[in-house]
A protein has these predicted regions:
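N-terminal Rossmann NAD(P)H-binding glycine-rich loop of SDR-like oxidoreductase domains
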Residues: 2-24
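NAD(P)H-binding glycine-rich loop region in Rossmannoid oxidoreductase-like domains
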Residues: 4, 39, 46-94, 98-101
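SDR active-site strand-loop-helix element
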Residues: 7, 33, 70-71, 107-113, ...
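Oxidoreductase cofactor-interface core, primarily capturing Rossmann-like NAD(P)-dependent enzymes
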Residues: 26-28, 117-214
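Short, polar loop motifs at secondary-structure junctions
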Residues: 31-39
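Short, conserved active-site loop motifs that form the nucleotide-linked donor/cofactor pocket
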Residues: 44-46, 142
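Conserved Rossmann-fold NAD(P)-dependent oxidoreductase catalytic core, especially the SDR/UDP-sugar
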Residues: 81, 86-131, 136, 140-145
Length: 214
């Protein structure tokens, strides 16, 4: 039986991930780190309310085998590039550092297609920097998931709905098949499946088609 940590449990992908972990017989404990208490209750669920800005909240955590980080925001929601960087990079890395100090062997990071720390595009660059920060911590096993457009269902943002509509039309005529939208529920399922199937120590980088092929 495995024990999991989750950061970003209230986002679209994180919510789906937590629900699936709770229903997975391979997991005995699911620890979520959130800013506010959750309404969800389950025998396996352990909720840790933390202050992202309090270093003492991020020293060590309960014993676990794998940590999943699904945290992320948008520039619009954050209000500035500095604030978005704080969420997408700094908060995720302090979570990863706590996991490493606590003896967690596997770290699974939800990144994005095109993540590159040297990119001229801010969003791609911060995703790449988050990956590099996690990589430098030297987990026994690291999985980077780089999906393209996420289908959040009713939670989808306007620009995401437009992008998905265009991409689906292109997919139907045989174009950009590797960049088809992926539902957050399917992504969460593949993150759990990837952690279970890719057992050898090392680093795994999974882009759109590789995610679906797990």
């Amino acid at each position: 039986m495995k024990r999991a940590w989750v950061l970003g449990a209230t986002g679209a992908t994180g919510t789906a991930l937590v629900e699936q972990l709770l229903g997975n017989d391979e997991y005995s404990e699911v620890h979520v780190f959130v800013r506010r208490p959750l309404q969800l209750q389950h025998a396996k669920l352990h909720v840790h309310v933390v202050d992202m800005e309090r270093a003492e909240d991020w020293q060590t955590g309960p014993a676990a085998d794998v940590a999943f980080s699904c945290l992320g925001t948008t520039l619009r929601a954050a209000g500035s590039k500095a604030a978005q960087y704080r969420v997408d990079v700094d908060y995720q890395l302090q979570f990863a550092e706590m996991a490493r100090r606590s003896g967690v062997g596997t770290f699974v990071l939800l990144s994005a297609a095109g993540a590159n720390a040297k990119s001229s595009l801010f969003y791609m660059r911060l995703k790449g920097e988050a990956e590099e920060g996690v990589r430098a911590l030297g987990f026994e096993r690291t999985l980077f998931f780089r999906p393209g457009i996420l289908d959040r269902g009713v939670k989808a943002r306007v620009n995401e709905r437009i992008s998905m509509a265009i991409l689906r039309v292109l997919n139907r005529i045989g174009l950009f098949k590797r960049q088809a939208p992926i539902a957050v529920e399917a992504l969460a399922r593949q993150m759990i499946r990837g952690e279970a199937r890719l057992r050898d120590a090392g680093e795994y980088v999974l882009a759109e088609r590789a995610i679906l092929d797990l």
